[in-house]
């Protein structure tokens, strides 16, 4: 049952949705606390993945954010998930990381880029971005030789 709950959680279902789904499909009653206890087990694994060492050089790094609205304390607020995808020198893609934020900003991206450097990235040849104001400055502050390409469609 834990695997089913984790699978539903990974697909973005809320604790309440998971609880209702388990009741509807399996006829079992589980508490919010039980669902939370099970889903909390993946947090250390996710943290370890987010902090893992990275390759020293990437041919291309794609940097983008996905924007969405969530309900928080009775209000609808805008959030962003930042994502960095690297293409290594052998042509393999790797999700370098994902970070949550309030909204997309060059300042937050500078923090992300410094985090990539701290995890072992020494250089990237090309950075593909959405032309966010100040993004080029943030990239060149961390990776001064990187060529910047602007894409027309987001990831």
Where are these predicted regions, by residue range?
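Short, amphipathic alpha-helical "recognition" segments used to contact nucleic acids or chromatin
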Residues: 1-12
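RNase H-like nuclease fold core
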Residues: 25-28, 37-129, 133, 137-145
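Short alpha-helical basic/polar micro-motif
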Residues: 3, 16, 125
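DNA-recognition alpha helix
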Residues: 16-27
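Inter-helix linker motif
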Residues: 143-155
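Conserved hydrophobic/aromatic pocket- or pore-lining residues that grip, position, or stack substrates
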Residues: 5, 18, 35, 64
